[in-house]
């Protein structure tokens, strides 16, 4: 656990019993996210599907990676380890870290070497919105863009509750995880969902991979990579 300072809130690992609260947080914070709006264009349906959709992504992070939260669980960041031979993507949600981030609008599905969506995506479809082809599309396109060949940590989502988005919680979550990346000499990857978050991530050491993920008739995502700092 990181020790808090005057400028740094306490960040800790999520507990299993906090799973449902974190899923609700993700669903609420991403209601106005541009990628979520494209995947679920009807707002009423989005509100219903979101908790299930993000719940599947959250479960993947709890099972395979880790979830960092603020002490009061008003902010959370989901991280997944990606082996060198795999691409892991589904439209991330790592946006503005103090908002709903689609930088991550990953709802955790995989794009297997840019091919057909893998079992994670199928699980998302079944759990969140069966028959929604836009979930398949965002999974395929982000999977195609996801770097392969180098092991790294992937940030599918970082988010703060709407009422806490000016408290610096998203930045504290990122600082904690990126410190781990630096200690372990591990690169990090995410997809920014707007130019504001892209600029913020650049200040943290992320570099735009050079080609946007353009959703048909919808928003773009900026794949970004960060090498560990010495």
Task: Show which residues each predicted segment covers.
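Active-site rim helix/loop that mediates acceptor-substrate recognition in acyltransferases
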Residues: 43-66
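Conserved active-site alpha-helix within GNAT-family acetyltransferase domains
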Residues: 171, 183-185, 194-211, 217
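C-terminal "cap" of GNAT-fold acetyltransferases
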Residues: 186, 190-195, 214-230
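Conserved acyl-donor/pantetheine-binding loop and adjacent beta-alpha core of acyl/acetyltransferases
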Residues: 76-165, 215-216
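Helix-loop element at the rim of GNAT/NAT acetyltransferase active sites that forms part
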Residues: 24-43
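Conserved GNAT acetyl-CoA-binding A-motif
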Residues: 151-153, 180-193
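Conserved acetyl-CoA-binding loop-helix of GNAT-fold acetyltransferases
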Residues: 157-160, 166-179, 203
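A short beta-loop-alpha structural element at the N-terminal edge
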Residues: 10-24, 28
């Amino acid at each position: 656990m990181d020790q808090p300072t005057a400028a740094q809130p306490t960040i800790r690992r999520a507990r299993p019993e906090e799973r449902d609260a974190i899923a609700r947080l993700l669903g609420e914070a991403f209601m106005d996210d541009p990628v979520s709006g494209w995947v679920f264009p009807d707002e009423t349906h989005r509100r219903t599907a979101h908790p299930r959709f993000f719940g599947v992504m959250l479960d993947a992070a709890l099972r395979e990676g880790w979830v960092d939260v603020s002490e009061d669980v008003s902010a959370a960041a989901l991280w997944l380890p990606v082996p060198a031979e795999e691409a892991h993507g589904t439209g991330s949600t790592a946006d503005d870290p103090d908002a709903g981030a689609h930088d991550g609008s990953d709802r955790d599905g995989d794009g297997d070497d840019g091919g057909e969506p893998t079992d994670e995506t199928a699980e998302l479809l079944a759990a969140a919105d069966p028959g929604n082809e836009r979930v398949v599309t965002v999974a395929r396109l982000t999977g195609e863009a996801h770097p392969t060949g180098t092991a790294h940590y992937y940030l599918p989502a970082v988010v703060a509750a709407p009422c806490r988005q000016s408290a610096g919680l998203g930045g504290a979550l990122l600082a904690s995880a990126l410190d781990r990346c630096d200690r372990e000499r591990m690169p990090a990857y995410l997809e920014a969902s707007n130019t504001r978050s892209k600029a913020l991530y650049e200040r943290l050491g992320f570099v735009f991979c050079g080609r946007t993920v353009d959703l048909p008739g919808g928003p773009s995502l900026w794949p970004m990579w960060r090498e560990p700092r010495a």
